[in-house]
Amino acid sequence: MTRLDNTRVIRPATGTELTAKSWLTEAPLRMLMNNLHPDVAERPEELVVYGGIGRAARDWESYDKIVETLRRLEDDETLLVQSGKPVGVFKTHPDAPRVLIANSNLVPRWATWEHFNELDRKGLAMYGQMTAGSWIYIGAQGIVQGTYETFVEMGRQHHGGDLAGKWLLTAGLGGMGGAQPLAAVMAGASCLAIECQPSRIEMRLRTGYLDKATERLDEALAWIAEANAAKAPVSVGLLGNAAELLPAMFAAGVRPDLLTDQTSAHDPINGYLPAGWTLDQWATAKEREPETVNRAARASMAVHVQAMLDFQAAGVPTVDYGNNIRQMALEEGVKNAFDFPGFVPAYIRPLFCRGIGPFRWAALSGDPEDIAKTDAKVKELIPDNPHLHHWLDMAAEKIKFQGLPARICWVGLGDRHRLGLAFNAMVASGELKAPVVIGRDHLDSGSVASPNRETEAMMDGSDAVSDWPLLNALLNTASGATWVSLHHGGGVGMGFSQHAGMVIVADGTEAAAKRLARVLWNDPASGVMRHADAGYEIAKACAREHGLDLPGIL
């Protein structure tokens, strides 16, 4: 089993020349490769895309076999991928998914990091995170609009809707957290983001998600103060450890206007540098003494969360951004770790009730002009949403594409299928140079059960019921998505979540149009169904408005 290969540089094909037998197999092939593009993945030489050890394939041997199989796969065959390893090709039919993926799934009693890590060391499993192992990660843009929407709502609730002259304190500039600085600036606030790995800061500077960086706290705070005085937001990366810096900042009287965290706290061994440790110490200990790292990281998280609680008690609006750090601190004895809320119940759930979530698409042509044309089409089809238009304008101006050109755009039931059909027509007419793939994050309305994140504090107490993502995956399979994935542990770590993903290809054919109409209606509708079942009136009203047939609910 080979997981490190420094000789590999993976980039997807672009243009209209196929390297597989059809666009339905070319698309997953290009998106798998895109996940490992050097401008996209965090550690592509190790197959790590983002989120600690979130991989695109189990090992390089498995990667090569997936590529080889996709290139020979017929349009009436389906490839099965088990935790990043291709295990079977079966005859199905043209409207069935071309790939079905299951990553990191464990029987609940054994769903722990300890058991998973043992399987991982033996080469029997792979951590797929959410979009790493499901081949639809598009770089930090994939989370930036959701982060922007969250920060805007925080500003509305806590600062009268105006974040000018305000600043956000956070930590973590990895594949998800790296979106925070740009999202904050887009929302009108400055951002001070602490990060312990220089390579991550450098990547965010290179891709335009971060304006400045320093190793000195005093310099970082001076830049923030200057920007706030001018009401000209700036994003600053500060090299350091959050578990050391947050308590020191609180003791020194520093008070941000907003506070959150996106360190990779979900994975104590691979994702969180213990306070007082160097990166070299950490790298060595992860291999030789993983339990020592685990204990030290968890102890540091307790200090980190206590500092966040101290800031909250001092009046700073504080929110958990879904990395399970509160749970880790609770287990370390911080009894009131959950005193600050998660971002979904605090800010996002009303959107989920209407099936609104992180809809995304990528241009297989590799031409940014295709994304510009689809942006214009979104504005044309949804003309009365100035907030959405503002987002698209900002994205076009500020977001640098990583790998294949792509766009994230939060839309919901009633709009997703219209956009998909319009994109398909643009491919058919030649307006777009090549097909597009349409997918989403697993963090969506009906595709995840995660009691410490997406389904935290459901009004009926159904936080941990994971039937819903299973039904979502089954429904998308039956509806004709091009590939469907079912994962465990994404975002919050082993034992704390189950979630499903789907991707569908718009290749300009009539057959694709029929699949798009089904999938892009049913997928968000299942989210409305889930929230209506939980008792949310917004979801029930949405279901009635769109004529959903929910016999046991309405």
Curated annotation (Swiss-Prot):
Single GO cellular component term: cytoplasm
GO MF, one example: urocanate hydratase activity
E.C. numbers: 4.2.1.49
Subcellular localization(s) per the UniProt record: Cytoplasm
Enzyme class: lyase
UniProt pathway: Amino-acid degradation; L-histidine degradation into L-glutamate; N-formimidoyl-L-glutamate from L-histidine: step 2/3
InterPro entries from the UniProt entry: Urocanase, Urocanase-like, Urocanase_C, Urocanase_central_sf, Urocanase_CS, Urocanase_N, Urocanase_Rossmann-like, Urocanase_sf
Source organism: Caulobacter sp. (strain K31)
Cofactor note: Binds 1 NAD(+) per subunit.
Protein name: Urocanate hydratase
Pfam family membership, one: Urocanase_C
Name of the coding gene: hutU
Keywords: Cytoplasm, Histidine metabolism, Lyase, NAD
One record GO biological process: L-histidine catabolic process to glutamate and formate
Binding site for NAD(+): 51-52, 129, 175-177, 195, 200, 241-242, 262-266, 272-273, 321, 491
Enzyme active site: 409
Catalytic activity: 4-imidazolone-5-propanoate = trans-urocanate + H2O
UniProt similarity note: Belongs to the urocanase family.
Role this protein plays: Catalyzes the conversion of urocanate to 4-imidazolone-5-propionate.
Gene3D superfamilies documented for this protein: Urocanase like domains (3.40.50.10730), Urocanase superfamily (3.40.1770.10)
Domain of life: Bacteria
Cofactor(s) demanded: NAD(+)
Keyword Lyase: yes
